[in-house]
């Protein structure tokens, strides 16, 4: 059987995660512990070597600092008391509810249930009633839809026959939704034609054949003049002139092309 705290209104064990301390061997300190327990327990006559008190009844100054640090760091699960530590903290019992208070609580619960039922009934949708448009909106067209609904109830175990009940006709009146139509036709248009005049720029061509013929006629005349003479220095001059004329003819052809 695990050891339990002997203090009044307490019963912590090591399974509760509390540190348990046995009564000290010092007689003077043990008397102080007995006085503490007897303060809330009239049937307490004195503790023995197996009597324990849990750590909930000691002030923080009664614990060794190193043991507190070790427990916070989870190195150890048990606290240690300093020499001469005496329990001073009593656990206050939870007050038991009185009979009058029990009746008041039951009445409060009933009133809360009634209020919730009333809220649900208010939130439930009721039959839609006919609403008339305002004076300012009487000119607008209104749409009235009246529907007759028949509700058929399912047969119960006691009454196998099907019962059909008619629901009174309800009218719904509301403003007509107006729609706007926009014409997206393409407007008339006129196309204007533009005519551009293009001038043809040609090249002036020269007749190269006539020029070459004139050059060859000049060379032939020179050959006729000097044909009777022997080949002298003048012959070399004529040949050079012929080469110059042929070169000029080639240049004329290149310019015309």
Swiss-Prot record:
PANTHER family: THAP DOMAIN-CONTAINING, THAP DOMAIN-CONTAINING PROTEIN 10
Protein's gene: THAP10
Name of the protein in its database record: THAP domain-containing protein 10
Keyword Cytoplasm tagged: no
Region of interest (Disordered), residue spans: 154-178
Name of one Pfam family that matches: THAP
Zinc finger (THAP-type): 1-90
UniProt xrefs under SMART domains: DM3, THAP
Record bears the keyword Magnesium: no
């Amino acid at each position: 059987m695990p050891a339990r705290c002997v203090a009044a209104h307490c019963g912590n064990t090591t399974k509760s995660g509390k540190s348990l301390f046995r009564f000290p061997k010092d007689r003077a300190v043990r008397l102080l512990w007995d006085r503490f327990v007897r303060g809330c327990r009239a049937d307490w006559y004195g503790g023995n070597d197996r009597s324990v008190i849990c750590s909930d009844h000691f002030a923080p100054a009664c614990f060794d600092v190193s043991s507190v640090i070790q427990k916070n760091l989870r190195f150890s699960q048990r606290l240690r008391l300093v020499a001469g530590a005496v329990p001073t903290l009593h656990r206050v019992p939870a007050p038991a509810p009185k009979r009058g208070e029990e009746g008041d609580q039951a009445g409060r619960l009933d009133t809360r249930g009634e209020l919730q039922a009333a809220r649900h009934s208010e939130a439930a949708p009721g039959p839609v009633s006919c609403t008339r448009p305002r004076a300012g909106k009487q000119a607008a067209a209104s749409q009235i839809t009246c529907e007759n609904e028949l509700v058929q109830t399912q047969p119960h175990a006691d009454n196998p026959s099907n019962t059909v009940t008619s629901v009174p006709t309800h009218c719904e009146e509301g403003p007509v939704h107006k729609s706007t139509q926009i014409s997206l036709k393409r407007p008339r248009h006129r196309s204007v034609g533009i005519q551009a005049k293009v001038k043809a720029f040609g090249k002036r061509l020269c007749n190269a054949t006539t020029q070459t013929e004139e050059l060859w006629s000049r060379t032939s005349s020179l050959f006729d003049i000097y044909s009777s003479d022997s080949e002298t220095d003048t012959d070399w001059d004529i040949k050079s002139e012929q080469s110059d004329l042929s070169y000029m003819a080639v240049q004329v052809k290149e310019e015309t092309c």
